[in-house]
Amino acid sequence: MLISYHWLFALTHTNFSAAEAKERLTMVGLAIDALEAQGQDFVLDVEVPSNRPDCLSHVGIARELTVIENGRLYLPAPEPIKTEGRSAVLTSVEIKDQDLCPRYAARIIRGVKIGPSPDWLANQLETIGQRPINNVADITNYVLHELGQPLHAFDFAKLGGQRIVVRRAAPGEKLTTLDGVERTLTADMLVIADAEKPVALAGIMGGEESEISDQTTDVLIESAYFDPHSVRQTARQLGMDTEASRRFERGADCEGVLRAQQRCVELICQMAGGVATEDAIDVYPRPFSERVISLRPERIPALTSLVVAPDEIRRILVGLGFQPVAENSFKVPSWRIDVEQEEDLVEEVARHTGYDKIRSELPPSNSSGEYQPREMKQRSLRRALNACGFDEAISFSFIQQDTRFELIPSLIGHENDQPQLANPIIEDAAWMRSTLLPGLLSSVRHNLNHGIRDVRLFEIGRIFTIFKAGELPHETLALGIVATGGALEENRAQAERELDFFDLKGALEAAVDSMNLSPLTFTQTSARHLRVGQSALIKSGNGTAIGTIGRLAESVATSYKFRQPLYILELDLGALLDGPEKLIQYSPLPRYPSVTRDISLLVNREVALADIYTVVHNQQVSDCRDVKLVGTFEGGNIPASKRSVTLRLEYRSDERTLRDEEVEAYHSRLTSALLDTFAAEQR
């Protein structure tokens, strides 16, 4: 924003030069990007923080400068003007949507003479990059840059029915704005209308049909407060960015509406003649609610290490417009929408005391730096997944609302309670994520688009849901893993095969084992984002359901344009880390050789591998040391309801070398148990 140094001087009588003002304002958080000479004046290009709309005016910057210099603010004194009649006799104002327009004031000036602005006004506007138009339009622009309140002047004779209606636009309604562009409006856009048609886009730009012209004699001055979100949304949809919209979408001063209008009316009467009505029609259905905040002096050194005298605290806050109402309590001015709590007052004092005076201190610590147990487990988890070929991803926490994915078990029932941002930076990312999967799948899609077919990713991050209305979102630490492509690198001797469910399951089990946690169990389940028959519920060592794993459902895969199988899992990592740890037992290295035997079974497709393992372990064959899955096969000559499962069993004794007949006896016993339990066939 461009600020005139001479204009600042008129408001502050500052002793600072333009260069000194630039330096001092930068030190209180109002960075000056550039300082340039403009004739006899200097122009400061101020980078105003997004939460400080009060500084989008010369008075706002001047207020900061007076506190820095311990000076005072010299606001223009009210000027007497000629008035006659009441506004309510000549016009009326109706607000049909009070949520989007909490306040609207209208005042009429009759008998004005439109012409060029005085040289001082035209030069002042040109200094800050504004093109002079005519005296009335220039005065509204001048007051906007002086006080920060956008205003608009209508040709009163061109208003149908001589009235103002603040309403939403009708779908498809047309309005030609002052830039000559015909715009098609939607039902969520707020307009200023007369009795017949829209005449302005609320808070953005006026309409061409009600524009001030050389023939104008009567004007209606609008001063209002519009909902920031509504103005921002409309401006973005229409691709518009105006001086008015920049201020309204950040938050204007709803209590400054009449003050700015009065200033505008005085200047018009002085420069364009005319007689103003005695008062304004001020429709204010939802008055400003004052905020009072207490500031404990001891909080300032506690938060900033700055020691500030009580008198200095009071001087700074009063200079910034805060009114003391008790010893340590202050009323927040209406233009400071960013101040909501005690810490905000501490920040104001710290800014003007000097951030450079804050001492560098290490935070207090009662012990040497070390990782906490949960952090150690997460480090082990990351290392294990890296060793399995997975890369860690970090995706955006703000996403589009997405109900394609079933939440992890602890959050089921809250699918419709995904937190929505009140002020999203990006319209397509207006929701806080309740699952990690959309971000991971988008990363997979990005890799596939760039020719990378083999993708293995995991993410550790927080997901958000609302359990009770009115409460803050509940945060859950989650783990998401996705895998697709080949299971082996192309330069290996063994032929490449496709990743499958068991590769992903094995990687998870290896990661859990690295954290010294009790083994997980898997039971067949169904989830809307997973393929039927290829999904499982993940349970921690204490039997708590913590997540799901499986192949991505065709409907979801199609929406992402995946043409190859993709396997995913998501679980509640916090619940997993809180699960029971396994008891570590040490044993000597085996002294005797082991013997392996394979067995291939034809089982029903619904038989879970975990159930097969359970049967083997329940036989209590002490010399059966391990059972592993070699592979599964479906299709071909195998019936559609069946699948082939090949297991490898390892036998070994700690006392001697097993004889062939002993191994065969063990193997026959386990084979019979599996055949009988699952009505299986041996292949």
Task: Please name every model-derived segment.
Residues V43, V231, H352, A422-P424, ...:
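Polyanion/phosphate-binding surface patch
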Residues M27, V43, G60, E64, ...:
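Extended, well-folded interaction surfaces typified by the phenylalanyl-tRNA synthetase beta subunit core
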Residues A77-V89, A195-R232, Q262, E266, ...:
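Conserved alpha/beta core surface patches that mediate binding of polyanionic ligands
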Residues L2-Y5, E20-E23, G319-G321, D338, ...:
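A carboxyl-terminal module marker
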Residues A10, R110, E126-P132, R246-D253, ...:
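Short histidine-centered catalytic/ligand-binding loop motif
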Residues L30-E36, E69-P76, R131-V136, G321-E327, ...:
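Short, well-structured beta-strand/strand-turn elements
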Residues T91-E94, L175-D179, T186, A202-E209, ...:
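Glycine-rich, charged/polar anion/phosphate-binding loops
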Residues M1-R374, R379-L381:
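RNA/tRNA-interacting regions in translation and RNA-turnover enzymes
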